[in-house]
């Protein structure tokens, strides 16, 4: 499928109608879903109605924005009024939100056409989209492999051309890791840049909504639309949003790029290292001043995250008890058995595991030893990044230690699965913007991602570095053969 700009030109020159573009996307979804399973719900009727509205605006001679008539997928942990929002969990299988999330509201106002709700790991807890209670999404480059997670459906849908762009959420790498494994661009904005109102919470101090696209430009256009202050989100930042399109300059002269030393070494696949090193050399050829930078506490990100995130999850998920909404167990003996049976039957294994870890870390005897200590280490990780950004504009490293693994390969070994987010987690702990973009393939033709990290609210720096690299290579033009 063409880029946002190309489709916009087709629309305003009447070469194609929004209805035709939407029908083409729905046809691709119809053909690929039996083997790909990117979507939990396909909203065809609503999509066609939105497309006709855009066509009516054009027929009336009205100007339309860049996203008008563009097919988009929405991760199924964002509330969509009147449309089921399941979070990939049995406990929310029949939940129909009575309100719209800020992000989906903004996209609808911009004329974007939602073609469906995408699959995810249950409550966004996972790195492979195998934890969904409903289906396992395949990787478009090899459907026997995982697309990454937790926003695997959103990444796979864009890679497979089922939609032009999509929306995901990122708590510890849930946008960037699937973007890397599916060979697309995924951006996690600065914490607070995009409203979380209507996003079903996993870990509130880490969650952030962001865009997926086939190109850096498409991701920038989508970010432009969803970023901005929202009084309904108390963590939303009251800042002026720059014009991100002005950052799309294919030149890195004078830019300082730091390579995080700690991300290379044990656990990193040889081919991934080779491809990423080659991409870093390319940045130098584009005029960037490349230097090694040490972030000594980077390696503590994973254990720190697996105390903080489950602790917040155990509190956030306490609300699912069968009383007000969602699944409720049949014929409980009393109130207590209604609570326990609803949660035992409604939550999947990984969600239960994280609730247990979090409850343990927050318990009176262990609070100081675990939760409080993790928060102190989080501050130290943040300080490492602050020090690094005193001497560089952008940091780079691999997005993931390996390429996409086989479905079922790591489900019995949670620790091995958790290591998939080794490179992405510290960025969330520090609240920084991070982007993954394709930088090559391994010997089996599986995509490899390069991660670029910026300072707080310096999405412009990240987008410029990513755009310059992308424009000097052909990786973004590759498509899976489905």
UniProtKB/Swiss-Prot annotation:
Keyword Nucleotide-binding: yes
A GO term, aspect molecular function: glutaminyl-tRNA synthase (glutamine-hydrolyzing) activity
Keyword Nucleotide-binding appears in the UniProt entry: yes
One GO process term, biological-process aspect: translation
Keywords assigned: ATP-binding, Ligase, Nucleotide-binding, Protein biosynthesis
Annotated catalysed reactions: L-glutamyl-tRNA(Gln) + L-glutamine + ATP + H2O = L-glutaminyl-tRNA(Gln) + L-glutamate + ADP + phosphate + H(+)
E.C. number(s) listed in UniProt: 6.3.5.7
InterPro entries, per database record: Amidase, Amidase_CS, Amidase_dom, AS_sf, GatA
Active-site positions on this chain: 75, 150, 174
One GO CC annotation: glutamyl-tRNA(Gln) amidotransferase complex
Function description: Allows the formation of correctly charged Gln-tRNA(Gln) through the transamidation of misacylated Glu-tRNA(Gln) in organisms which lack glutaminyl-tRNA synthetase. The reaction takes place in the presence of glutamine and ATP through an activated gamma-phospho-Glu-tRNA(Gln).
Sequence similarity: Belongs to the amidase family. GatA subfamily.
Quaternary structure and interacting proteins, as annotated: Heterotrimer of A, B and C subunits.
Entry protein name: Glutamyl-tRNA(Gln) amidotransferase subunit A
Organism: Acaryochloris marina (strain MBIC 11017)
Lineage: Bacteria, Bacillati, Cyanobacteriota, Cyanophyceae, Acaryochloridales
